[in-house]
């Protein structure tokens, strides 16, 4: 009997089934119910260097990398697929959790005349302040400006809106994720989120996104300039934060001082974050809001300070409204009809359901 067991132990592996008189050898235990033995994945020897390589590629925990390599018999591609499938299962388990923390990411592509503002949520502020989370938001923003966006609602002012029911339209877009070795790896936005969920163990979602489209200037030869701002007290790089805005300007003529125009554009993006307007002009106030004022015997002008950008006191020149300052600057820069074509302002959690 002992000789039979020793023979079985020497020859037992994942491909060979050894008859041992109805005694199974499994992780050193004798079981009397089966007539074969197999090698457990935990018995696969995993070289440390492979664990290190897989961790650098995927940023997954060390133990998960080891399990993936054991399950794939030390095949790197197989281990990566194993981690992705496990990550999908983890994401599925976590998706019912409330994610109301996170960041706003903003990005302008001056070459194409496009801009994006998106909200990416996590469960905790701790995760949202980490570089892994923030860098993913930056990578996703960059990818969305380099690819066509399907679905969504295109407003008259040229803003393309993706609400929570439509934002998954961007998930198939490919992005490049840089691993710890500095090597870029291509994957879909969806898979990149799955990977970070698997690593951070939190429900992570893209809540919404808005895109400024290139200016259609076929009619009046208008020019445009786009600026953005994200408020983050912990960083000098103002592209992610808990508040953010993108704003598009339109004008005619040749500007005699682009630096002054850029400075004003950046300052107005900050003004929008600070003062929370929701429309550009009085004429943009929704009819439903005006109707509500009428029903409540409330003067619509009482809304101007809070809602209308042009009617607000410009924070960098308080004696002037934003509209007045635009007129002054337009004359100073030698251009005509400097105006705000559109803007969007996001704040973390303002559309999320909290419990």
From Swiss-Prot:
Coarse class of the protein's main subcellular location: mitochondrion
Transit peptide: 1-46
NCBIfam families xref list: tsf
GO CC aspect terms: mitochondrion
Disulphide linkage map: none
InterPro entries, per database record: EF-Ts_dimer_sf, Transl_elong_EFTs/EF1B, Transl_elong_EFTs/EF1B_dimer, Transl_elong_Ts_CS, UBA-like_sf
Protein name listed in UniProt: Elongation factor Ts, mitochondrial
Alphabetized Gene3D superfamilies for the sequence: DNA helicase RuvA subunit, C-terminal domain, Elongation factor Ts, dimerisation domain
GO annotation, biological process: mitochondrial translational elongation
Location(s) in or outside the cell: Mitochondrion
UniProt-listed Pfam families: EF-Ts_N (PF25025), EF_TS (PF00889)
GO MF term set: translation elongation factor activity
UniProt family annotation: Belongs to the EF-Ts family.
Task of the protein: Associates with the EF-Tu.GDP complex and induces the exchange of GDP to GTP. It remains bound to the aminoacyl-tRNA.EF-Tu.GTP complex up to the GTP hydrolysis stage on the ribosome.
CDD domains xrefs: UBA_EF-Ts (cd14275)
SUPFAM superfamilies listed in its UniProt record: Elongation factor Ts (EF-Ts), dimerisation domain, UBA-like
Domain of life where this protein originates: Eukaryota
Keywords for the protein's UniProt record, in alphabetical order: Elongation factor, Mitochondrion, Protein biosynthesis, Transit peptide
């Amino acid at each position: 009997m002992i000789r039979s067991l020793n023979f079985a132990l020497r020859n037992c592996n994942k491909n060979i089934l050894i008859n041992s008189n109805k005694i199974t050898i499994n992780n050193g235990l004798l079981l009397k119910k089966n007539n074969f033995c197999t090698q457990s994945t935990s018995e696969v020897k995993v070289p440390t260097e492979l664990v290190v390589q897989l961790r650098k590629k995927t940023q997954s925990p060390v133990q998960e990398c080891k399990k993936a390599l054991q399950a794939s018999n030390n095949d790197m591609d197989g281990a990566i697929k194993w981690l992705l499938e496990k990550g999908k299962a983890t994401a599925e388990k976590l998706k019912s959790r409330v994610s109301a923390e996170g960041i706003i990411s903003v990005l302008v592509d001056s070459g194409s005349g496009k801009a994006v503002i998106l909200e990416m949520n996590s469960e905790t502020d701790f995760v949202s302040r980490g570089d892994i989370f923030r860098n993913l938001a930056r990578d996703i923003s960059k990818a969305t400006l380099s690819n066509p966006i399907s679905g969504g609602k295109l407003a008259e002012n040229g803003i393309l809106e993706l609400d929570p029911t439509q934002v998954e339209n961007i998930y198939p877009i490919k992005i490049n994720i840089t691993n710890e070795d500095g090597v870029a790896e291509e994957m879909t936005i969806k898979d990149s989120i799955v990977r970070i969920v698997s690593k951070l163990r939190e429900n992570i979602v893209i809540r919404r996104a808005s895109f400024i489209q290139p200016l259609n200037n076929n009619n009046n030869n208008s020019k445009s300039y786009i600026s953005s701002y994200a408020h983050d007290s912990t960083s000098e790089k103002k592209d992610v934060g808990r508040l953010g805005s993108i704003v598009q300007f339109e004008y005619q003529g040749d500007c005699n001082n682009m630096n002054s125009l850029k400075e004003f554009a950046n300052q107005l993006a900050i003004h929008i974050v600070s003062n929370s307007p929701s429309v550009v002009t009085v004429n943009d106030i929704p009819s439903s809001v005006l109707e509500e004022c009428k029903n409540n015997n409330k003067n619509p002008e009482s809304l101007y300070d809070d809602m209308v950008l042009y009617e607000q006191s410009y924070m960098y020149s308080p004696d002037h409204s934003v509209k007045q300052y635009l007129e002054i600057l337009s004359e100073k820069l030698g251009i005509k009809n400097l105006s705000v074509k559109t803007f969007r302002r996001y704040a973390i959690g303002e559309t999320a359901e909290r419990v």
